[in-house]
Amino acid sequence: MTELALILVSTVLVNNFVLVKFLGLCPFMGVSRQLETAMGMALATTFVLTLSAVCSYLAYEYLLAPLGVEYLRTITFIMVIAVVVQFTEMAVRKTSPLLHQVLGIYLPLITTNCAVLGVALLNLQEQNSLLQSAVYGFGAAAGFSLVLVLFAALRERLEVADVPLPFRGASVALVTAGILSMGFMGFAGLVRL
């Protein structure tokens, strides 16, 4: 149980996928202009990333490894992620049309988020069990969501701030992301595995 808590804290704070491993930067910069859209993307990513981490583990352990075709893991994981995203979109559309309308384009965009594939591959590299893979996926998603929502709130504040003209837009956003990353570096000594 302690190991699962360490994995969770490590993936959320210490080894954050966006700020430390630089995975998922595209949605981090692209969807963080408004807090509402960032929250929708964070919710969808959390569900899909956790589920795809578990499904990728199962596909590797019970399909690829027994057949001796481990070299197909990347393409298999991409297909698993695409299937999870499509099933998630169909389930959300069927059960809650309002939520589907709110999430809109964000669900299909998760398929191209490199953090989702990164979690599947890093799970394999770290030789996590099924439960550890689920916690690792959830922690990575929670860390991604935390940083995305924080960054979106900061960007909304920057829109009304008196920023010099040359620094407006992407320039001040990248500087802000760097400062946010330095803030998360303070968690580096928190977990020792």
From Swiss-Prot:
A single GO cellular-component term from the record reads: plasma membrane
Which E.C. number(s) belong to this protein?
Answer: 7.-.-.-
UniProt keywords (A-Z) are: Cell inner membrane, Cell membrane, Electron transport, Membrane, Translocase, Transmembrane, Transmembrane helix, Transport
Q: What class of enzyme is it?
A: translocase
Question: Which membrane topology term applies here?
Answer: Multi-pass membrane protein
Q: Does the keyword Metal-binding apply?
A: no
Q: Which residues cross the membrane?
A: 4-24, 38-58, 65-85, 102-122, 134-154, 171-191
Q: Does the keyword Transport apply?
A: yes
Where this protein primarily resides, as one coarse class? Answer: membrane
Subunit record text: The complex is composed of six subunits: RnfA, RnfB, RnfC, RnfD, RnfE and RnfG.
Belongs to which family? Belongs to the NqrDE/RnfAE family.
PANTHER family the UniProt entry points to:
INTEGRAL MEMBRANE PROTEIN OF SOXR-REDUCING COMPLEX (PTHR30335), ION-TRANSLOCATING OXIDOREDUCTASE COMPLEX SUBUNIT A (PTHR30335:SF0)
Query: What function does the entry list?
Result: Part of a membrane-bound complex that couples electron transfer with translocation of ions across the membrane.
Put simply, this protein is called: Ion-translocating oxidoreductase complex subunit A
Give the organism, scientific name.
Alkalilimnicola ehrlichii (strain ATCC BAA-1101 / DSM 17681 / MLHE-1)
